[in-house]
UniProtKB/Swiss-Prot annotation:
A lipid is attached at C25 (S-diacylglycerol cysteine). It is found in: Cell membrane. It comes from Staphylococcus aureus (strain bovine RF122 / ET3-1). It is a lipid-anchor. A lipid is attached at C25 (N-palmitoyl cysteine). GO terms for cellular component: plasma membrane. Disulfide bonds: none annotated. Belongs to the staphylococcal tandem lipoprotein family. InterPro entries: Csa, Csa_sf. This is Uncharacterized lipoprotein SAB0040.
Length: 256
């Protein structure tokens, strides 16, 4: 009887040990992922985008020694009401540090429903550049609505704030070291600062609080190969999707 009790105690102890080790590893990877993103997210907000010309970012052997790199700034909102087409609006800006010049485009896309028999998007691009921290079209635009949208556009990096990133806990963590691919997902509330900012700027047709997804590829400690994206997912299901995407990344300048 005593032997059975001892075996049971040992078994329970080993079980708790395994659970503790597994939990510890998960928490460790979560902190690694957050720390990897924090290098970039700690720069938010950058109200004057021209300040990026003086920010070095992560560099590795993919950069030529004389190349300061190009910052790539992206923000977009995608809205697909239930059973309808998806409407996407966003902007991409390339900021070349060596020449302190920019080029990019504002885009509008309508992605048709798959139940129409074909998957087709209808992206239209409007080339832009930045002058004195203002985005301006480089070609004539007849559509006054599009002109106004470009004039009023702000990248998320200009108003987002992740000072509370370290407070996000118990995320849904995914990590594949072979690819490598990694992500951390957190449920937010509508009282979250960044959620309030998005609702202030976009007509988001749902009261649901979003999930924040930090997703990336490449070495967790830093790499110019791969990407790091953030996404606020308000709705994600078949036939209905609402999400906001953003990224800020330094890459070698060739072909920009």
């Amino acid at each position: 009887m005593i032997k059975r009790v001892n075996k049971l105690v040992i078994g329970i102890s080993l079980l708790f040990l395994v659970i503790s080790i597994t939990a510890g590893c998960g928490m460790g990877k979560e902190e690694e992922i957050k720390k990897s993103f924090e290098k970039t997210l700690s720069m938010y907000p950058i109200k004057n985008l021209e300040d990026l010309y003086d920010k070095k970012g992560y560099r590795d052997d993919q950069f030529d020694k004389n190349d300061k790199g190009t910052w790539i700034v992206r923000s977009s909102m995608s809205i697909q009401p239930n059973g309808k087409d998806m409407n996407v609006k966003g902007m991409v800006l390339y900021m070349i540090r060596n020449t302190r010049t920019t080029n990019g485009y504002y885009y509008v896309d309508v992605i048709e429903r798959e139940d129409k028999g074909i998957h087709r998007d209808n992206e239209k691009r409007y080339p832009v550049k930045m002058v004195d921290n203002k985005i301006i079209p480089t070609k004539e635009i007849e559509d006054e609505k599009i002109k106004k949208e470009i004039e009023n556009f702000k990248f998320f990096v200009q108003y987002g704030n992740f000072k509370d990133l370290s407070k996000y806990k118990d995320g849904d963590i995914s990590y594949n070291p072979e690819a490598p691919i990694y992500s951390a997902k957190y449920q937010l509330t509508n009282n979250d600062y960044n959620v309030k900012q998005l609702r202030k700027r976009y007509n988001i047709p749902t009261n649901k609080a979003p999930k924040l997804l930090l997703k990336g590829t490449g070495n967790l400690k830093g790499s110019s190969v791969g990407y790091k994206d953030i996404e606020f997912t308000f709705v994600e299901k078949k036939g209905e999707n609402i999400y906001f995407s953003d990224s800020l990344h330094l890459e070698p300048s060739e072909d920009k």
